[in-house]
Swiss-Prot record:
ATP binds at G10, P11, A12, A13, S14, G15, K16, S17, T18. NCBIfam families: cmk. Keywords: ATP-binding, Cytoplasm, Kinase, Nucleotide-binding, Transferase. It catalyses: CMP + ATP = CDP + ADP; dCMP + ATP = dCDP + ADP. The keyword Secreted does not apply. It comes from Phytoplasma mali (strain AT). This is Cytidylate kinase. Its EC number is 2.7.4.25. InterPro entries: Cytidylate_kin, Cytidylate_kinase_dom, P-loop_NTPase.
Amino acid sequence: MKGFKIAIDGPAASGKSTICKLIAEKLNCVHIDTGLMFRVITLYLIKNKVNWAQITEENYLKLLLNNCNIYYEKNHIYCNYQKMCLEIKLKRIEIDNKVSLVASLPFIRQKLLLLQQEIIKNNPYLIMDGRDIGTIVMPNADLKIFLTANIEQRILRRVNEFKSNKSVNELQKITNNIKLRDHKDFNRLISPLKKAEDAILLDTTDINIIETVNQIHNLILHKKKLLNQNEF
């Protein structure tokens, strides 16, 4: 069974995870949010009182993460048998302040890459989103999409996500956070965020979530037709 694999990449607050979750529900397939994996590790480090001054030391990280077991089950992420989604939401700001640093560390990227590729091997039908899926994690994906939107729209989406009061200070804080995240993601030395050469660019600035889901669904159906595949 060959299967059908979809890679979705894009910058912060481009709507990747929300859209991929809806598509996975529509197609009844596995959805893997790789950004969530980095958030889980970041939360694990915070809870285990990591010494951030030593975070770049590989031996220190290996020892600290030796008992960190991350896995997916029925589209939910677990760490050491605990479902993590709610706790990640509750500690969102604390995690946001450190996740870019954690995601830039070679040891952690390699650790999660092995996990991601194991998931890909064991799930013929899946949609995976992140920042290097089409370029590094799943370069042979059947369909690659680079999802983006202008920074003003992404800021607005993040404000709505946080249910912020939209005060001037809050807007500035979110704006600075997204701009800094963009800079780090596009310029990091290992697996920087970039569009795969064979990815379809989809700008969602002027379309809503449902319209985006429908456009991607149509792209999936078109690609499957080209591959002479009927089932999903």
